Amino acid sequence: MKILIAISSKEYSESTLDVGMNIARVLKASTTIVDVGQKISEFSMKDVSLANELMETWDIDRPGVDVLEWAFGYLLKNKFIEQRTTSDEFPKNLLIENDSGRAEVLLKGSAVENLSLILRNGDIIKELRDEVDAYEYDLTIIGGSAKRSMSHDMIQYINSSIFVVNNFNKTINYKILLAVDDSPGTKKAVKYGVRVAQAFGIKVQIITVNEDDNSNKANKKSSENASKMMRRCGVEAET
């Protein structure tokens, strides 16, 4: 399984990263953390000699590198990665760019086996969509945006399951609201619901929305199956 965690800033992405990495730990998933920095003009591209160079040779950091530095420090502090040397600085010299402008550094994870930080620049929705399409992620974890239209667009246009972390607070006792029906995606939603509940030790509320009597019967069966799965996995659930 492959997870993509999208972060945007040091100020607002800590809960997204925390929730995402704890989910990744439980799922034992290959995980990529991405920041989409502001678009780089052609003038700036020439200025910092971006094409096919190592970060240590750049005169100027490209937009977004500071966010990756923060994410690296967070991962190290919370023991999600192993310290490579006596230095705990972000290894800019290992951040290498490909022809499309996507820069990546591979890390040795202690919580998950395959972990990397990547940087893309441009329109956030387009870049995330391109990343998901090119590398076939199963789950994308994003923060709740102050612009509701942006979160809506991400859910609509990104071709993977979406988990939105909105104003997460560790001191609050949350529940998962799991909507099920007879659609093909329900089994995957139930599986993710179980894993997230296990990651945070929280309850699940299972709901269905019936359009007519026929859907009522099918959805009731889906709800019963979801409840059985929760019990089997030791997750407390209500319907």
Language-model segments: what does each one mean?
Residues 58, 73-140, 232-239:
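Structural beta-alpha unit
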